[in-house]
Structure formats: structure tokens, C-alpha cells
Amino acid sequence: MKSFNPKSILIIGMAGGLARITAHLLSKKYPDIPMIGIDSRKIKNDFHLKNLEIIQMNYSRGNFEKLFRDKNFDVVLHLGRMSHVSTNPGFNLRKRLNLNIMGTSRILDLSLRFKIKKVIVLSTFHVYGALPDNATFLKEDAPLRGSFNYPELRDVVEMDQMATNWMWKNQNKIQTVVLRPCNIIGPQIKNVITKYLTSATIPTPMDFNPMFQFIHEYDMANVITESIRNVPTGTYNVANNDVISIREAKEIASNSPQYSLPLFIVGPMAKALNKTFLNIPEYIFDYIKFACVINGDQIDTHFDKRPIRYSSREALELLTLE
């Protein structure tokens, strides 16, 4: 792959914690390169970065097209996938489908039309699904079975498939990288697994104790930053080499002893709490039942120095210090 120095960067999903950290790393690495961060959600503008402009806008075709036309981007970071834990409870499956799938389609089409040099799309390891016959360490060519049992993962799987198909179709015209990280955790990441790990209310399953992988938010932002220059077109898992059981992970993250119950009790218990304040989707209980561990060796071959600093255990320990 012929590396290049970016001249202008668009960050989509700027209200998210990962995008915020990535913007800081990019500003440090490329202090003279203009960056624009956009989001349809309200963005807390406390960055104090001279080369970053913040814009709140709806993800409509007209808004996107004007932005791409007016600004001469050569790198697009699509970090704006709407997760299942949203600050807006009105984001149901239909709205997520529109934002994640249709929004991604617009971004990719405009990137090709306006001759963007590189696009990085943030996906997730959830696309593989947590099933009893999963391989020990899933590689990038493993089937995407995440939505087999849970329709709420449909948008995640379809977005990944669409981005991957588009990537190979246009590989001679534009560099595209699809990242499938393991569980991202950190003080600025408000996702499903963080809610589960830090909840003192939801117990661990007595009858299951699968292995998990965790990556610290700073490390994931560093992977994204370094991928701009170093990682060629392709789909890549992003994960630590170490694993840790869900019981031990929850004990570390909550900084307190845990109690366990049979899974058939844990699930209904969480559903009842979801109606009040917890908002943990049902699919997470397959992930605390069956392991979904990924192999992240492929992306490491493209880095002179591995951008992941913290182990899974260290990432969990850092979560308790914040």
C-alpha cells in the first residue's frame, strides 16, 4: 500500500466518546491539517483544538453533498454508527436502520463521487454473533451470524456487509478499511457492555462463564489514527491477544464482589430492569453465554509498532480508576 499524508479529514459521529478521543490524537499527529467533526446529535464543544471545526447537522443527502462539495476532504472516518444504547430513547430499530444503513450508503457513495482517498468505517465484532459452535478465535472470513437470533443486530450486520461489498467493488478507486473491534471500554464510552459490567444490579450467570476481550478507548482511537497511513484496503478485527472471563471482568469493572444466578433468572431480571432505567438489549445475554473471541493478528502486520498498549485486564482496571 502506498501511504499518504492526509490533507483534510472528516470525522462522522463527533458526539461520541471514541470520535472525541480520535480527534485529539489526530490533532496531535497532524496539527496543521484541517478537520471537521459532524454529528446529528448535540456536540459538546470543549475540544480547544485549533484545527477542528464542529458542525451539528442532520445526516441527509443534501447536507452531506454540500459538505463534501465545499470541503476538499481526502480522509473520511465513519465513526457514527448509532449503538443500541443511545442518549435518545426514541432511537428504535427503524431509526437505527435508517441512520446506520442509509447514512452509511450516502457516505460511501459521496466518498467515491468526490474522490476521497481513504474511508475508515467502524463496525463491531458483534456481527459474528455469539453462538455455541463459534471457533475459538474468529478470523475476518468467518460468517456474519449476529442477526440470526436477534433482529436488533440486523442494522449492524447489514451495515458491515454493505461497507465490505462496496469496499471490494471499488478497491481500485478508493482505499477502504472496515474495523471490527472487540468490546471498547473507557470513561467516555457509554455502551452496552460497560452498562452491564458496572451494574451492581445485574448478576453474572452461574452456569456460563465465557471468555471476553476488551480494548481501551484510547487504544482504539490510536488504531483508527494509525490506520490512516498504515492499513490497506480490507476488513480487520481489532482485539487484544489476552482474554478474561466475564465473571472476573465484571468483578474488576465494578470494583466489588459479584453474585451469580442461573442465566434463566438473569435474563428476565434484566428485562424487568430495562423497563425502568437499565436499557440492556436482550442479545447481550447470548454474549455472556457463548464466547465470541476474535483474532486480531491481521491488522497488526501493518504496524511497525503495535498501537494497542493496554491488555484486557488493564483496560478494565483503568475503567475503575476514572
Place the predicted regions along the sequence by residue.
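Conserved C-terminal active-site "lid" loop/helix of NAD(P)H-dependent oxidoreductases
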Residues: 217, 245-251, 272-306
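N-terminal Rossmann NAD(P)H-binding glycine-rich loop of SDR-like oxidoreductase domains
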Residues: 4, 8-29
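Amphipathic terminal alpha-helices
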Residues: 2, 298-300, 306-322
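Conserved Rossmann-fold NAD(P)-dependent oxidoreductase catalytic core, especially the SDR/UDP-sugar
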Residues: 105-152
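Mid/C-terminal beta-alpha module of Rossmann-like enzyme folds, strongest
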Residues: 221-281, 319
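Active-site Tyr-X1-5-Lys
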Residues: 148-177
